[in-house]
Amino acid sequence: MAKEELLELDGIVDEVLPDSKYRVTLENGVVVGAYASGRMRKNHIRILAGDRVTLELSMYDLTKGRINFRHKDANSTRPPRSGQPRR
């Protein structure tokens, strides 16, 4: 059986929910629920509200997605962190 086709879309994290789930607004204005991919959890990549992310959506359920990438650029709406760096 062939691997299913996935839609890749960009969005902005609106809200961080319990159990490492997120509410994301896509570029087209649709709000979906999402979770961090295993690779992001394994590498302890932190996702905060306001981050710009790339999602994968299944063709079968367009209300749930998997966050694959967190963009690090000036287009992110989160303010820069002040103070000393974390260790």
From Swiss-Prot:
Record's keyword terms, sorted: Cytoplasm, Initiation factor, Protein biosynthesis, RNA-binding, rRNA-binding
Subunit structure: Component of the 30S ribosomal translation pre-initiation complex which assembles on the 30S ribosome in the order IF-2 and IF-3, IF-1 and N-formylmethionyl-tRNA(fMet); mRNA recruitment can occur at any time during PIC assembly.
Family per record: Belongs to the IF-1 family.
GO CC annotations on file: cytosol
Source organism (scientific name): Burkholderia ambifaria (strain ATCC BAA-244 / DSM 16087 / CCUG 44356 / LMG 19182 / AMMD) (Burkholderia cepacia (strain AMMD))
Entry function: One of the essential components for the initiation of protein synthesis. Stabilizes the binding of IF-2 and IF-3 on the 30S subunit to which N-formylmethionyl-tRNA(fMet) subsequently binds. Helps modulate mRNA selection, yielding the 30S pre-initiation complex (PIC). Upon addition of the 50S ribosomal subunit IF-1, IF-2 and IF-3 are released leaving the mature 70S translation initiation complex.
Pfam family, one: eIF-1a
Keyword Transit peptide part of the UniProt annotation: no
Protein name from the UniProt record: Translation initiation factor IF-1 2
Localization, UniProt: Cytoplasm
Primary subcellular site in the record, as a coarse category: cytoplasm
Domain S1-like: 1-72
InterPro entries linked: NA-bd_OB-fold, RNA-binding_domain_S1_IF1, TIF_IF1
Molecular function via GO: ribosome binding; rRNA binding; translation initiation factor activity
NCBIfam families found in the cross-reference section: infA
